[in-house]
């Protein structure tokens, strides 16, 4: 009887939290349009003050993960964007209006893709449920932007954890109810998207143990996401009661590849030396051979990279994206036929992979086959519409085809996705000049200019 009553109690709590997630924020809260503007202004300032990871494999991995979870959410209120900041601290934060930021240190600390997805799902709930609007003590959007500025500090050392900084951080600390709502809805979205809901519990347990062992050096993530053993217990109970299933084993986790890319960005030669020593100890290991090949590619040693990646592919063809890596290396070794074959192999398995389409577009450009390059970059835009580089590449490809109208148009969209609205408007105006005044295409462009100006 107790189990039945407990199950009903947990289900009731979850139902209330779910209903609350789409309930109205306080009357004094900023509007949704104001939240979107705040998100855009915050991104502009973040680009000035923080270092972003601008690597297609890292960016598109995180973006793809976020899009996959958003499909499970369904009711999307905001134009969501996902970013990775080059920062060794373990942190992630959401900004009202749809922007989610992950520190590279967090990616390095998670053990699986599912754990990282659990963090993203949690942050999506905070945004979609308008928790920031509830935290704000007034309708003054400028004040909220000022409080969010605490996230722009590149390093939050002991001196920063005092006085005004800690006061501002506390203003962004989510309540117990908000955290439970983000936990319970988040694991539901996680499972619906095909990720392991238990990963959220695993990640929280590890954070909790670390906090107990080192209460002074707690992760920045916990400053705004208070963690208690009761919160973990409640999440475990929710997973059991909702009957959320763990997915079947999916092979080698792509997170290891992404973590290696991030590591190579910091100190490539030191990482390559470590990878070389690791392979010397296990010369028959396909993964050790593959990792060293990636290291050589990152440092421009293309022939060595090719030889190792080919060896790894022969030994273990199931390594995720090994054909994509080979295709990219073949471009640099001028073996274009092999590059095409490698890309075709991976696209048969993963036709919607934007990174492969990006590299294939680069291959077509090397061959001066610009129409085919355009088709590849259009695929990148299709599968990663909010990634600026896809639009930029498309604009340059159209320029090589002597189609300046389309070139300026897509370059404008790349600026817009980087929140450079002035440059976007200028490029759209240049694009409009290449179409007749009464043409439908020009009208679309002029409407876009008007919409950008109206958005501020």
Model-found features: residue ranges?
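Catalytic Zn2+-binding segment of zinc metalloproteases
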Residues: 114, 124-141
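Extracytoplasmic and endomembrane cell-envelope/extracellular-matrix remodeling and assembly machinery
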Residues: 27-28, 40, 52-54, 60, ...
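Canonical positions in the second alpha-helix
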Residues: 278, 311-312, 345-346, 379-380, ...
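Structural marker of alpha-solenoid helical repeat scaffolds
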Residues: 281, 315, 349, 383, ...
């Amino acid at each position: 009887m107790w189990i039945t009553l407990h199950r009903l109690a947990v289900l009731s709590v979850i139902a209330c939290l779910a209903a609350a997630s789409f309930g109205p924020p306080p009357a004094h809260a900023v509007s949704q349009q104001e939240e979107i503007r705040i998100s855009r202004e915050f991104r502009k300032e973040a680009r000035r003050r923080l270092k972003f990871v601008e690597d297609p494999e890292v960016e598109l991995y995180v973006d793809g993960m976020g899009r996959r979870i958003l499909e499970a959410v369904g009711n999307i209120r905001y134009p969501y964007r996902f970013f990775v900041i080059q920062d060794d601290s373990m942190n992630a934060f959401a900004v009202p209006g749809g922007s989610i930021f992950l520190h590279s240190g967090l990616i390095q600390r998670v053990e699986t893709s599912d754990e990282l997805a659990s963090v993203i799902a949690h942050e999506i709930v905070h945004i979609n449920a308008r928790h920031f609007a509830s935290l704000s003590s007034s309708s003054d959007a400028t004040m909220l932007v000022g409080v969010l500025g605490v996230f722009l500090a590149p390093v939050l050392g002991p001196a920063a954890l005092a006085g005004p900084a800690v006061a501002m951080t506390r203003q962004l600390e989510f309540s117990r109810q908000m955290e439970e709502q983000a936990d319970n809805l988040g694991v539901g979205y996680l499972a619906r998207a095909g990720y392991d809901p238990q990963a959220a519990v695993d990640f929280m347990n590890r954070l909790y143990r670390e906090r107990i062992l080192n209460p002074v050096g707690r992760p920045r993530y916990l400053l705004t996401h208070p963690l208690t053993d009761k919160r973990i217990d409640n999440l475990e109970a929710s997973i059991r009661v909702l009957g959320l299933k763990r997915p079947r084993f999916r092979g080698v986790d792509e997170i290891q590849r992404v973590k290696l890319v991030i590591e190579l960005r910091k100190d490539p030669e030191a990482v390559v030396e470590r990878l070389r020593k690791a392979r010397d100890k296990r010369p028959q290991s396909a993964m050790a051979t593959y990792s060293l090949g990636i290291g050589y590619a990152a440092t421009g040693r293309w022939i060595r990279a090719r030889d190792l990646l080919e060896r790894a592919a022969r030994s273990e063809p199931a390594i995720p994206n090994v054909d994509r890596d080979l295709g990219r290396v073949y471009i640099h070794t001028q073996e274009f036929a092999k590059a095409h074959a490698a890309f075709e192999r991976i696209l048969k398995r993963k036709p919607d992979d934007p990174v492969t389409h990006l590299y294939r577009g680069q291959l077509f450009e090397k061959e001066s086959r610009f129409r085919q390059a355009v088709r590849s970059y259009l695929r990148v835009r299709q599968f990663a519409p909010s990634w600026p580089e896809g639009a930029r590449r498309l604009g340059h490809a159209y320029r090589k085809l002597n189609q300046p109208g389309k070139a300026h148009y897509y370059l404008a969209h790349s600026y817009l996705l980087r929140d450079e609205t002035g440059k976007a408007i200028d490029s759209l105006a240049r694009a409009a000049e290449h179409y007749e005044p009464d043409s439908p295409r020009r009208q679309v462009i002029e409407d876009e200019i008007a919409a950008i100006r109206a958005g501020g």
